[in-house]
Amino acid sequence: MRAIKLRCEYLKNPLGIDVVAPRLMWNCDSGVTQTAYQVICSDDDGNVLWDTGKTAGSAMRAQYAGQPLKSRDTVTWRVRLWDETDGAGEWSEEAAFEIGLLGAADWKAKWITGNYSINKKERYPVDCFKKTVEIKKERRKARLYITACGLYEVRLDGRKIGDFCLAPGLTDYRKRVQYQTYDVTELLKTGTNELTVQLADGWYRGSVGAWGIRNQYGNETKLLAQLEIVHTDGRTDTIVTDDTWQWSNDGPIRFADNKDGEIVDAFRVPSYSGKAKLTTHGIVPAASNNVPVIEHERFHPIITVAPNGKKLLDFGQNIAGYVSFNFHAHVGQRTVWRFGEMLDESGNLTQKNIQCVSKKKTTPLQKIEYTCAEGLNEYKTTFSVFGFRYAEVDTDLELRPEEIAAIAVYSDIEQTGYFESSNPLLDQLVVATVWSTKGNSLDIPTDCPTRERHGWTGDAQIFFETASYLFDYAAFSKKYLCDVYDWQRKDGCLPQIAPYGGVDFYMNTMNGSVGWSDVGILIPYRFWKLYGDRDILEEYYERMKCYAGFMIKRCGKNGFLSKRLGISGEAKKYAVNSGQSYGEWAEPEDVHPNDWKDMVAPHPEVSTAYTSYVLGCMAEIAEVLGHSEDASTFKKYSEGCKKAYQTMAEKADYTLDTDRQARLVRPLAFDLLNEKQTEYAKKRLLQALENYGWRLGTGFLSTPLILDVLAEYDLDAAYRLLENEEMPGWLFMPKNGATTIWESWEGTEAQGGIASLNHYSKGAVCEWLFKGMCGIRVDGENHFIISPIPGGHFTYAKASYDSVFGQVESSWKRDGNKTAYSITIPANTTAEIILPNTPAQTVTAGTYTYSI
């Protein structure tokens, strides 16, 4: 038995973390059961910092408990395992982690900015900084620690340092600024080195949100960098940002905005004729402890001429990313590129579906204006990212497909889930969901890569389990939780968007919306269930408790524009009839038309349901952590809200006798009804589906729940709904050429045509394909429940999930009256296999086949 897939805090060989007692993790590649492990950690010189010795246990993780670690410490580590025969396996390959800069005293650098006066109404060219670094001695190692309020790109002698795109990533820069650590040992040379940095507006000062509001976090972009060179004689040279750095803003990038694009004069060269100006920020940078945003897949276009006479490039896949191109040209020749997700009725590129137009601004522009230099021009976008499948190019230059690429840009999340079936449309839907996850994982989970690009908490919470089946989402999600809790108010309220920049007064009133702000409890809860990580509950418990208290305070209260519920006594005491809320959100237009005015008034049905459910989760968390008094309080309110919901369900305004599927799915999913109501709701849901032609009538919150609910009592109904190819329905999207998941069931026809074609939320159905259709569920540490449920017209389905405990696979194939099952359980885990009409069986690692 050998340890594989070594990770530190869910990261591969992280450089510059700020966790001084990190958890070291691994998987087992063979054998049945791990009975013991040994972890040895050593420093740069090979001195042992920690040796666990042979430690009994099957846990595939150990928390570092060796000599205290300090800033800049490098630790290499390896693992040896003992199997069920007590035989010792080979040592694993070595892994490593390095501590970053832990405190303010470690930072000798000063914040610098461009040397010009700022008018927040103006836009400015990209700042260019330069520092000459002389090296005379032999180096042992060198590290660059760098961050910005804005976006930076750093180069050494013209070569980009690292592969991070859009660094330093997105946070609420008023609360937390994350820095990166780069190993530049091999990039430096003896003699003269030129360190150059470009600094752009980014999220800090650039366009943010649907309306493209600027200066959300500040209006002065700034840079902080510290280069530490350790020589072989033990001495360290430190080069820091200060007012000796050269500066100018006369370089090639004349304008750069995340959403709107870049204006580039390729013939310009920065003069660095001025000096940087000192400034301050008042926050000690923090390590990101997250995977970087990097370039991934590349696509070359099919080039045609659009009806409007401009060149039209079809890259074949809707992505979040940017372009690279090269061609020969004369100085001053100009090309203009626009990017979008769709074509209009005439066959020209349109941005209608992604733009919000106000009197002040149209955004996003998703545009590049490029003026050529003489000779060979080589360009790649630096400080913008777009959502697009198509590009429209206005130019008289010849464009060659092989010299143009669309580059997908997203966080370096590793795909862990794969699915295939006998239905090609369903397989395409899963692929589209994978692409929407990629396109909306850019340091934070976003709603779309075009119009808003916000970290909407509702999207994140409903999609978390699907994302975690499809990708290693652990480090990414932990970083996002930091963003969520960075904004928490003193009363416990959590934001609807994280990081939150304070969009406007109206949007501010929506913070605390159930289904959205509940992310602060639901992601840690589900993280614990999927990753077996109780530490995340410990880390956030007090803050989760604070949000739970905020929910409790709303019980029994009436809010602005609240309607009378017609209930009294205990039910009235626990009903939630206060607080603004998005409600179900985005139900099909013919089921419940969207009306922005709905958000002004409370949604007592949705709010009471979610308060009961979330406080129930919180009670379970408190119990497992040993907070029994808290658990009793949370359970009391959860049960109180449940009974209030049952009372409300007897009233005309909230009756279960409805064709609104969400009103039936939600209480069934959250177990809110009494026995009589439950049986009625089950039958009424089937009737509602029949009345709607077996199409999806749910909205944002209930769509991920409906198949789970149906499969519990009518599997045929679940499959009938899944296989529906008409609108509204999941398969309608791939049937109509979607390569990513749409925001609205109606696609581009919804909400007056404003609807993103890359919104992952409706792809949350993929969770059910893994845990329902193929039956893969994590059930505690090192244990799975495998309970596949064949059905519908499917003859075959297979899912594999590379979980934190190892890769598990489940497939089934029907042939006449027989169904063949194949199930693979990873080393050092067990599983309970539950097959139709067959007694449950508990198994250890191995592959198991059945024919039933």
Residue ranges and their predicted role:
Residues M1-R451, D459, A475-F476, P495-N508, ...:
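Extracellular/oxidizing-compartment recognition motifs
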Residues E90, R205-S207, T236-V240, W337, ...:
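Acidic/polar loop patches that form or flank catalytic/metal-binding clefts of enzymes
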Residues N219-Q226, I239-S271, K277, P285-H296, ...:
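Non-catalytic C-terminal accessory modules of carbohydrate-active enzymes
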Residues Y152, K160-D163, A167-P168, V484, ...:
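Active/binding-pocket-proximal capping segment
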Residues A142-I146, Y322-E341, A391-D394, G458-Q488, ...:
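Alpha-helical support elements that line or immediately flank enzyme active sites
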Residues L151, D242-T244, S248, E398-A432, ...:
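Active-site acid/base region of carbohydrate-active enzymes
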Residues L195, E452, L470, G520-I521, ...:
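C-terminal capping/lid segments that line or modulate ligand- or cofactor-binding pockets
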